[in-house]
């Protein structure tokens, strides 16, 4: 009996030895069908430390030979004088007079057809601006090809032609949007981001080499909480942010590439949630594409070129509230334009997405500066699981 058991043990040992030898001869161990398969790199996350419209430096911005646009106070001086006197009287008594008071003309910021066109001044001359060529042509006012409306393109800082930025045509003769004025100073300090107005995230997937990679994917997502700043007021790197719980703000993934440190993407639409000061709204950009430079410290800086939906642009400029009181008129007054003027001027400068029935363009080309710093992007499902 004992001899029989010994033979069984010897047979099992021999079988195990054969299996081991056969396993060693295989090109790949069991369970690894392709040991040479490369593992995809983990996604890289970023948060925007800068995100603002292009306002050219003063030496490149061009001139407004007919001056700047007027405000309602300039256009309706008698009614505004009566309203202001009553406003100051009530303020001294601890009261408040709303901006849509009957002493003023009908509020065109709430109903843009409530006032006539005041003759809004657009910027019609040459300028040197940052931006991208969105339509693939050096457009001229005398004509346009399919997919756009006639407009004069700008020149870029490296001599390139065909830069599409009709937003500067619209706002270039508004005093508050001129170089070194109100909006430019707010942009310089990234005020809207740092004060908690919005946090915009970016995630890049498939980036094997930050300097050269012929196939990456880029996605922009709104965050559900403000950015984190250090004691000096600068955005902190490598902070975790949770993406917005509403997937409406998890935008379409854009295919892209990196060549010699220059990142570019194909066009996609995206929406950005913003809740800052008197605005609770979203930005809607169409056919947006990025061109950025990867920096040695991991940041990415560059330009977004996009078409800003015209109706959305008017809404973000004028749909402002403090409690029950509409503040669009207040915002327009402080920046230096009339809502009726902006409304009537927008179709004149619009250059993208022609309406199939009327042929009129419904979006306005724009350029935005961005600076993305390394961060960790957490999806809402993962955040809840934690």
Language model features by range: what are they?
Residues 3-13:
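Bacterial N-terminal signal peptides that target proteins for export
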Residues 4-5, 19, 363-365:
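Generic secretory/membrane-interface signal
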Residues 21-23:
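C-terminal motif of bacterial Sec signal peptides marking the signal peptidase cleavage site
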Residues 27-386:
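Extracytosolic secretory-pathway proteins
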């Amino acid at each position: 009996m004992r001899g029989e058991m010994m033979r069984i043990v010897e047979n099992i040992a021999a079988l195990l030895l054969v299996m081991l030898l056969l396993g060693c001869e295989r090109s790949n161990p069991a369970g690894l069908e392709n040991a040479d398969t490369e593992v995809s790199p983990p996604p890289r996350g970023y948060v925007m430390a800068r995100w603002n419209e292009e306002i050219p430096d003063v030496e490149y911005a061009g001139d407004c030979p007919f001056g700047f646009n007027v405000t309602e106070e300039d256009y309706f001086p008698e009614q505004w004088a009566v309203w202001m006197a009553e406003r100051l009287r009530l303020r001294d008594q601890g009261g408040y007079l709303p901006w849509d008071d009957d002493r003023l003309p009908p509020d065109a910021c709430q109903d843009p057809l409530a006032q006539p066109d005041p003759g809004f001044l657009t910027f019609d001359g040459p300028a040197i601006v940052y931006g991208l060529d969105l339509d693939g042509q050096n457009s001229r006012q005398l004509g346009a090809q399919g997919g756009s409306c006639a407009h004069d393109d700008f020149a870029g800082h490296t001599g390139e032609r065909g830069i599409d930025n009709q937003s500067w045509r619209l706002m270039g003769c508004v005093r508050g949007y001129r170089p070194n004025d109100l909006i430019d100073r707010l942009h310089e300090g990234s005020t809207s981001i740092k004060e908690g107005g919005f946090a915009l995230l970016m995630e890049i997937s498939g980036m094997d080499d930050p300097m050269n990679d012929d196939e990456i994917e880029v996605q922009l997502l709104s965050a559900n909480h403000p950015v984190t700043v250090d004691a000096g007021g600068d955005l902190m790197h490598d902070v975790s942010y949770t993406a917005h719980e509403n997937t409406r703000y998890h935008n379409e993934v854009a295919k892209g590439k990196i060549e010699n440190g220059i990142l570019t993407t194909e066009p996609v639409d995206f929406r950005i949630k913003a809740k800052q000061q008197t605005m609770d709204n979203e930005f809607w950009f169409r056919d947006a594409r990025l061109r950025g430079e990867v920096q040695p410290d991991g940041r990415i800086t560059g330009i977004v070129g996009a078409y800003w939906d015209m109706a959305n642009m008017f809404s973000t400029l004028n749909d402002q509230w403090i409690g029950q009181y509409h503040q669009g008129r207040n915002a327009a007054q402080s920046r230096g334009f009339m809502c009726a003027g902006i409304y009537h001027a927008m179709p004149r400068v619009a250059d993208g997405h022609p309406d199939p029935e009327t042929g009129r363009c419904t979006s306005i080309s724009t350029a935005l500066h961005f600076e993305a710093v390394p961060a960790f992007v957490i999806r809402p499902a993962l955040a809840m699981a934690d």
